[in-house]
């Protein structure tokens, strides 16, 4: 169960979800027709060791009961491939528009500073818990990897004064910026999401961009059942006990009321657009597909 001042590293609580997502991206990259290729996703899983490394060991059978090799896992990998492709394209468009400041909120194991073809002069600010950033930095440094853009770590909890920490790291609010909140909002209570959006708006000059992944809350009784099901299966801390199921202002409306032009895309529509199944009627995965929207906004 979450509490207001909890913290984590890469293998505990919210931090462990970054490994789950990285494993999904790595499995997507192994497909003959991947939607996105993250060459570092498998590297992070191997560095974490244990079951995470075991998913990719040559000649070893994956754990037969690992969720990523279930029907749900297959759909989740499709989702991660599509989500990665969408936000990669978002950054390409922002870069083409002349934006040279990028902010990754709750960066986790995002490797875009290393794998995207950033224009010269681009600075990528990565905000996350100190131990999460440390893990990523050490793993990639050990391999001799160098970021394409200038990468600046901002070790801060997004429930604290992250705006001050970001500007102290060199971020210039007078210049256009591109923001990303990917796989983040569900881990924030509604009040924290409001504060996050307000911070983005306050620090964004005209011609800035913002992209978020958001979801509609589940019915309370369904959410309570899912939490109890997770506990009963001995999987507490996997997902439902980590997220907040609170109603919040939709990103399209919130940014639109403040002078941004926001365009939402449903996950189901985007999956179809990129040639992946969108089983909205599936009893296990359908609710998630139907609930998620990917939103891009630009500030006039």
Swiss-Prot record:
Coiled coil: none annotated. Disulfide bonds: none annotated. InterPro entries: Ppm1/Ppm2/Tcmp (IPR007213), SAM-dependent_MTases_sf (IPR029063), SAM_mthyl_Trfase_ML2640-like (IPR011610). GO terms for biological process: methylation. Its EC number is 2.1.1.-. S-adenosyl-L-methionine binds at residues 128, 157-158. Transmembrane segments: none annotated. NCBIfam families: mthyl_TIGR00027 (TIGR00027). Exhibits S-adenosyl-L-methionine-dependent methyltransferase activity. Belongs to the UPF0677 family. This is Putative S-adenosyl-L-methionine-dependent methyltransferase Mkms_0379. It comes from Mycobacterium sp. (strain KMS).
